[in-house]
């Protein structure tokens, strides 16, 4: 829901031509901490408050400070996100079966090492097949993304041969095919006071991640983003996400890079991305449940490598 609602608004209103917005892995530790302390309602309210802060930051022209961030920081940020994405896919790619993965990087790899004897070879074969298709397909046809072909082919193979590998459906169960109704969360003055620090955390980190993603995309396509407009768009998107029960959204550098690699050059690509997700949710959710998690992991591993 967040990727659909916030993603559309970020592309429609944003200051970057190719930015793809939505929830990101870099935010999951923050989200987890807020939910643990304040509950889901607290997270939703903090997301809305963060959106208001981001709009104010944009109106105050604070997006311009991005030009003072050194290039090594941008490179380090991108590499860090790539490493985070890669490390988050190991469990699904090898079928390790870890139910609860620690969010901390070192602890996460410790859990992987401890569970490596549980590698599921069927899952690994599916992941390797998806990886091979993604790498080879561009030599056959550059118009159709290799990731899409990989997901379709591996989903069909798993279904036809009734392979016992984890899929979106087996992990998440029945997926809702409806958008939630807009709802203003219950709140009081004391709750707002307690949520000011988390809201500022979401706003500051979301702004930095979005603007750094925009800088990276500028370097890839030779464009120049409008940083203050990007902050305003991010703020509007987070308010809308919260009102529909979503989580914080920001510029997603992995999806932005994937967008550029697949030929996206205008905001229309981001809007089509959001509409496509909506259509999948409304029309093809039963088919989406068939997608192997190992195949999704392969797609994200390639995205991380390309970053």
Per-region residue spans from a language model:
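Transmembrane helical cores of multi-pass ion-transport proteins
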Residues: 1-307
């Amino acid at each position: 829901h967040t990727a659909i609602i916030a993603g559309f608004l970020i592309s429609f209103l944003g200051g970057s031509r190719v930015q793809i917005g939505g929830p990101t892995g870099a935010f999951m530790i923050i989200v987890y901490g807020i939910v643990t302390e304040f509950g889901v309602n607290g997270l939703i309210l903090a997301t809305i408050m963060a959106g208001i802060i981001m709009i104010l930051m944009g109106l105050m022209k604070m997006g311009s400070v991005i030009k003072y961030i050194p290039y090594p920081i941008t490179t380090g940020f991108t590499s860090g996100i790539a490493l985070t994405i890669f490390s988050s896919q190991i469990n699904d790619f090898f079928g390790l079966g870890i139910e609860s993965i620690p969010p901390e990087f070192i602890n996460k790899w410790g859990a992987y090492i401890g569970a490596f004897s549980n590698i599921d070879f069927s899952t690994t074969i599916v992941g390797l097949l998806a990886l091979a298709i993604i790498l080879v397909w561009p030599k056959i046809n550059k118009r159709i993304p290799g990731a899409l072909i990989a997901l379709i082919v591996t989903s069909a193979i798993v279904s036809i041969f009734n392979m016992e590998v984890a899929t979106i459906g087996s992990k998440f169960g029945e997926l809702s095919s409806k958008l939630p109704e807009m709802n203003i969360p219950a709140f009081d003055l004391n709750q707002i006071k307690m949520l000011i620090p988390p809201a500022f955390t979401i706003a500051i980190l979301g702004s930095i991640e979005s603007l750094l993603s925009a800088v990276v995309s500028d370097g890839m396509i030779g464009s120049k983003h409008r940083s203050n407009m990007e902050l305003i768009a991010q703020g509007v998107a987070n308010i809308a996400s919260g009102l529909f029960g979503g989580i914080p959204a920001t510029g997603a550098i992995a999806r932005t890079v994937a967008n550029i690699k697949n030929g996206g050059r205008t905001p229309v690509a981001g809007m089509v991305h959001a509409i496509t997700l909506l259509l999948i949710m409304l029309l093809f959710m039963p088919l989406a449940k068939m997608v192997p998690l190992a195949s999704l992991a392969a797609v994200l591993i390639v995205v991380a490598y390309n970053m």
